[in-house]
């Protein structure tokens, strides 16, 4: 009887972890769908470039603070030391899903509390300009999505970890590979994000702040990420760094 109860609890525990991972993933998906409208100024009543309702200084302080909260969460929870401490409190298979969940919540906070600054820097209101900018904006999202699948979408967002735990299979780290986009730049995912952030027919001060802060954050985060990748993959990644540019294809061997 006790053995059956232990097995039952084990199954319930694994089922909970699996459902938790699925919940975190779909929370992330909904956040991304909302981000398309928020950053692209489409479909939503409030977006990145909505009309200003606060003073310039107040809005700037709030917006930079919100982006700082996201950057802090995104960076701290990705550090090896934090993961080691965090997985003492939660099951290790839940770590990636929890990271995805907290990242989604941090983004939701940005969307919710964002204070638009309506000062316009550029405005391409003609049809040709809008088609070009929105096409590049859409291309950015496509590059982001495809890049995640090239390296393993389900591992990146925690589903592989919780599924293997549910199946009582050991997690194995992904092998180093450089498919498709990764043969031309080391970080195509971030190239996609840059297109998403910057390709807008209407650039307000708020949008410029958002794009600038996130771009600076990514450029700093890349340095930390590459140190981790070298630690994991060793000489393979060192050779890759020497042969493939960081962000701009066909310009030198290293950027």
UniProtKB/Swiss-Prot annotation:
The keyword Acyltransferase does not apply. It is an enzyme of class 2 (transferase). Catalyzes the methylation of methanethiol (MeSH) to yield dimethylsulphide (DMS). It comes from the Bacteria. InterPro entries: MddA (IPR054700), Nurim-like (IPR033580). The chain crosses the membrane at residues 16-36, 56-76, 99-119, 131-151, 191-211. Keywords: Membrane, Methyltransferase, S-adenosyl-L-methionine, Transferase, Transmembrane, Transmembrane helix. It is a multi-pass membrane protein. Its main location: membrane. Its EC number is 2.1.1.334. Gene3D superfamilies: 1.20.120.1630. It catalyses: methanethiol + S-adenosyl-L-methionine = dimethyl sulfide + S-adenosyl-L-homocysteine + H(+). It is found in: Membrane. The keyword Thylakoid does not apply. GO terms for biological process: methylation. PANTHER family: NURIM. One of its GO terms (molecular function) is methyltransferase activity. GO terms for cellular component: membrane. Signal peptide: none annotated. Belongs to the nurim family. This is Methanethiol S-methyltransferase.
């Amino acid at each position: 009887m006790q053995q059956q109860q232990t097995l039952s609890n084990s199954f319930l525990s694994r089922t909970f972890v699996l459902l938790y991972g699925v919940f975190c993933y779909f929370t992330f998906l909904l956040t991304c769908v909302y981000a398309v409208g928020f950053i692209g100024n489409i479909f939503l009543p409030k977006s990145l470039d909505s009309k200003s309702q606060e003073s310039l200084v107040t809005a700037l302080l709030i917006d930079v603070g919100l982006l700082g909260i996201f950057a802090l969460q995104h960076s701290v929870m990705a550090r090896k030391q934090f993961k080691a401490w965090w997985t003492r409190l939660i099951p290790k298979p839940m770590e990636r899903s929890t990271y995805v969940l907290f990242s989604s919540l941090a983004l939701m906070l940005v969307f919710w509390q964002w204070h638009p600054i309506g000062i316009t820097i550029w405005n391409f209101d003609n049809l040709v300009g809008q088609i070009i900018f929105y096409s590049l904006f859409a291309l950015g999202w496509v590059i982001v999505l495809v890049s995640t699948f090239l390296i393993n979408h389900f591992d990146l967002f925690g589903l592989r970890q919780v599924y293997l735990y549910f199946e009582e299979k050991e997690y194995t780290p992904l092998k180093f590979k450089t498919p498709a986009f990764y043969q031309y730049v080391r970080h195509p995912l971030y190239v996609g994000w840059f297109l998403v952030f910057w390709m807008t027919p209407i650039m307000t001060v708020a949008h410029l702040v958002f794009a600038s802060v996130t771009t600076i954050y990514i450029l700093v985060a890349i340095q930390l990420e590459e140190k981790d990748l070298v630690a994991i993959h060793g000489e393979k990644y060192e050779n890759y760094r020497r042969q493939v540019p960081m962000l701009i294809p066909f310009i030198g061997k290293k950027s």
